[in-house]
Amino acid sequence: MNSTKTEPAGVSDDTEARCQIVRTLDIVGEKWSLLIVRDALRGSTRFSEFRDSLGAPSDILTTRLAKLVDAGVLEKRAYREPGSRERSSYHLTESGRGLSLVMGALVQWGDTYNPYSGGKSSKLVDTEGHEEVSLAFIHPSGRALTTEEVTLVPGPASRIRW
């Protein structure tokens, strides 16, 4: 997939096309899409695994998987179990693995601002020591910043001034 996409599908307004958030939501903003990515990050690769975990209708799941493949988030691979027909499995690409930061931010936000009374259903841990980690904005000096110390400003491609 071209990483410098200028006209995302479904976005006709040039101002919207310039916005990274609009372009990203065009790919993963529909119901089920981020949940498919979540399950793929947890190791799911087969249609039946996604269907059973999510409870998504098969036609919608098929559409979302195809869209994520077309967008370069997932890669479709053929496999065949002995005595069965050929099927497809779905694997995260580099782009898809990059969404782990988004998923981590959603987990962290949910734990902080919308916690479940029964405790955490997911935790962010490092792969070696399995110690819990958190996401942060890091200043070039290496210092972690609070959300009050970070703001969103127009970039060079923006046509608006805030």
Segments and roles (model prediction):
Residues 65-66:
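Short, hydrophobic-biased segments on the C-terminal half of alpha helices
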Residues 69:
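Acidic donor-binding segment of Leloir-type glycosyltransferases
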Residues 76:
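Short beta-strand "wing" residues that participate in macromolecule-binding interfaces
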Residues 19-60:
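N-terminal helix-turn-helix DNA-binding core of bacterial DNA-binding proteins
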Residues 2-5, 104-162:
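C-terminal regulatory/oligomerization modules of transcriptional regulators
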Residues 5-25:
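Short, Lys/Arg-enriched N-terminal segment that forms or immediately precedes the first helix
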Residues 29, 81-103:
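Basic, amphipathic "hinge/linker" alpha-helix immediately C-terminal to the N-terminal HTH DNA-binding motif
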Residues 72-73:
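Glycine-centered, phosphate/nucleic-acid-interacting loop/turn motifs that mediate DNA/RNA or nucleotide
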